[in-house]
């Protein structure tokens, strides 16, 4: 942990929420106005800033797997809020509440990543932490869940699931965990040039103290559908479609 600057889990969550909000302001409110040069410039800045959000959530999920004593409850909470958020996600991004062919919200990606980590941990408990069987079978499970993310069209797709797994696996393998963080970001960076703007996250994650900080779990979960609903209403008004 670096000296002079530190962040708790709560601090990281607040930062991730803020950057996510800025990203979605750009995506929902400004994207329809890209013909305007000023709107286009602000849009690009906000989307670049927003690239820092998702990797922090991936990291915190990987950390949460280490500490949760109720994995089933954790998974059900993710699933519940993913289902609750989907209409708001559709409305914010499309202007309608339902769309079977549209991408599914990022909480589904986090859920699939969480399931991949739980399977890996179960295999490690059975075969041993570094056993080849655990590595091969865990990798196969992660690949299957990453494929499922692509099939379902979840936000960030397979790259998102793989990033979650890498945030769990890689940092402990390096003397300087910053190297592991950089490696974990590679799948995202390969999906889009803009994802390189997530690299400053490495400094924030390295400042993580391992402490949870003051948290209200329900608030952090509820913020996701609430802010999407608000942005959707600002962008599209209220429509029963």
Task: Give the location of each predicted region.
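Alpha-helical transmembrane segments and their immediate juxtamembrane cytosolic regions
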Residues: 1-241
């Amino acid at each position: 942990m670096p000296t002079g600057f530190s962040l708790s889990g709560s601090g990281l969550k607040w930062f991730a929420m803020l950057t996510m909000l800025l990203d979605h302001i750009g995506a929902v409110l400004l994207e329809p106005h890209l013909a305007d040069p000023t709107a286009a410039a602000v849009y690009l800045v906000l989307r670049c800033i927003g690239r820092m959000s998702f990797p922090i959530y991936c990291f915190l999920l990987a950390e949460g797997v280490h500490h949760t004593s109720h994995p089933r409850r954790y998974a059900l909470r993710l699933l519940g809020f993913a289902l609750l958020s989907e209409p708001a996600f559709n409305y914010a991004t499309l202007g309608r509440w339902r769309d079977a062919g549209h991408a599914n919200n990022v909480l589904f990606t986090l859920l699939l990543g969480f399931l991949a980590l739980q399977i890996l941990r179960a295999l490690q408990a059975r075969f041993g932490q570094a056993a080849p069987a655990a590595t091969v079978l865990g990798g196969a499970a992660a690949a299957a869940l990453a494929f499922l993310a692509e099939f379902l069209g979840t936000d960030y797709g397979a790259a998102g699931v793989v990033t979650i797994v890498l945030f769990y696996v890689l940092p402990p393998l390096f003397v300087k965990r910053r190297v592991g963080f950089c490696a974990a970001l590679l799948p995202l960076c390969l999906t889009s040039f803009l994802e390189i703007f997530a690299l400053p996250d490495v400094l924030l994650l390295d400042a993580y103290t391992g402490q949870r900080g003051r948290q209200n779990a329900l608030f952090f979960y509820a913020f996701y559908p609430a802010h999407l609903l608000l942005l959707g209403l600002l962008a599209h008004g209220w429509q029963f479609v």
